[in-house]
């Protein structure tokens, strides 16, 4: 029992679970980005802004680049000819940048899932290494355990067998073409925690997003934010912390110039995201509103806070993924349909993203007060794993007057998704009232025995 408690409550390394100061920026120094996929007259429409802006960021960088990316696997496009080879495109862009600028430091931080916990190599990561880009695999063992008590077993026995050194003999269900997996890798996977961040940083600007450069995710709907100013130093500090806990280092120093302006922005990670969300939800009253668009919602603190805010007559609307698709495989609707039923009974309007094989992968809140708007968005789903110092996550919080263009853009984005059937469907479309599934969700959320 003490080992389980220690694994769940272990000290967080310095630089993890960070909330920066709020920095003032001008209207043109923070920008909302979105990827939208929808059907129109039986034709799939894919309208994307995020990775085109990422490529622009890479092109304009002059001093350094730091990327922290969760999913970075190029599943064969033959699996679905509509998929975009984003992994290859980003790899080529970075390799060319290094070739043209051999003295520029480029760091690429990623999760061990992309080499399936050392069962096989990732050809795109190998290409970057050969080009002189430093690839850092995140050591998640130093963070709190997500799947208890399984992680106690893993720490006691399988962990000490080490990594499989790119050898395996079990089938891999996640990639095409198939590559064999070691049993030690499967055992490590079952800890269910990851470096889930999606950050692209240069000395000029940063992009924080919910979008992975991963072919099987390339049609998902996502959001992102481009930002400039002093916040870049906090992002770099946090990325240095991940490199350090992974046995590496990022040897970059720079000091962005202070900026002024009507908009305030803050960098928040891990459990500080939950703290920011709860603080804003708990301040809602009848004169305020909250619009949420999110891929997963299951965290009990968030759910309870939303129900209490509705009791205070706050206007709340929640747009969810129906949790029915994952890379061509059918899902069972947990946890969103169970939480949606609970929130629906509390009087909160719910709609479902109208997806067709892709996912509504957005993670964003829009708090509207009489004179201002607070926007929180990035990589973090609203789950215990994402908000409880178990995964690594990165979000931005933005406070802006209602008249500002970014306030208007995010509100119009959500309004369009909510109002039009090509984007969203009524609650009844995926209504789920199974008591058994509800308590299965509660068990999985409590123990971490799930992928959400």
Label each region the model flagged.
Residues 1-452:
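Charged, low-complexity intrinsically disordered terminal segments
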């Amino acid at each position: 029992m003490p080992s389980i408690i220690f694994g769940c409550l272990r000290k967080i390394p310095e630089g993890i679970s960070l909330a920066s100061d709020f920095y003032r920026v001008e209207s043109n120094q923070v920008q909302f980005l979105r990827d939208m996929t929808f059907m129109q007259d039986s034709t799939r429409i894919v309208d994307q802004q995020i990775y085109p802006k990422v490529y622009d960021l890479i092109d304009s960088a002059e001093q350094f680049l730091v990327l922290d990316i969760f999913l970075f696997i190029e599943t064969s496009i033959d699996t679905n000819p509509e998929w975009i080879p984003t992994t290859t495109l980003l790899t080529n862009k970075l390799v060319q940048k290094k070739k043209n600028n051999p003295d520029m430091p480029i760091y690429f931080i990623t999760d061990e899932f992309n080499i399936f916990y050392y069962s096989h190599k990732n050809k795109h990561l190998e290409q970057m290494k050969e080009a002189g880009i430093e690839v850092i695999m995140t050591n998640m063992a130093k963070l709190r355990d997500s799947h208890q008590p399984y992680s106690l077993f893993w720490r006691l026995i399988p962990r000490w067998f080490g990594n499989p050194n790119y050898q395996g003999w079990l089938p891999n269900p996640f990639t095409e073409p198939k590559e064999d997996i070691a049993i030690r890798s499967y055992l490590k996977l079952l800890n269910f925690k990851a470096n889930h961040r999606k950050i692209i940083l240069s000395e000029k600007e940063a992009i924080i997003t919910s979008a992975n450069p991963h072919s099987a995710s390339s049609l998902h709907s996502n959001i992102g934010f481009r930002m400039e100013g002093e916040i870049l130093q906090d992002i770099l500090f946090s990325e240095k912390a991940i490199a350090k806990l992974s046995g590496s280092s990022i040897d970059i120093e720079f000091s962005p110039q202070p900026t002024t302006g009507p908009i305030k922005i803050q960098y928040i990670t891990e459990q500080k995201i939950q703290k920011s969300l709860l603080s804003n939800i708990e301040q809602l009253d009848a004169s305020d509103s909250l619009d949420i668009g999110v891929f997963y919602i299951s965290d009990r603190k968030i759910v309870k806070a939303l129900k209490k805010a509705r009791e205070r007559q706050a206007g709340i609307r929640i747009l969810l993924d129906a949790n029915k698709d994952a890379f061509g495989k059918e899902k069972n609707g947990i946890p969103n349909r169970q939480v949606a039923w609970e929130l629906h009974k509390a009087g909160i309007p719910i709609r479902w993203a109208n997806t067709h094989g892709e996912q509504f992968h957005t993670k964003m809140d829009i708090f509207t007060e009489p004179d201002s708007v607070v926007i929180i968005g990035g990589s973090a789903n609203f789950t215990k794993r994402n908000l409880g110092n178990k995964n690594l996550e990165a979000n931005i919080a933005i406070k802006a007057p209602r008249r500002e263009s970014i306030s208007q853009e995010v509100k119009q984005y959500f309004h369009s998704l909510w109002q039009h059937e090509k984007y969203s469907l009524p609650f009844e479309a995926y209504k789920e009232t199974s008591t058994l599934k509800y308590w299965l969700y509660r068990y999985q959320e409590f123990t971490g025995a799930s992928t959400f």
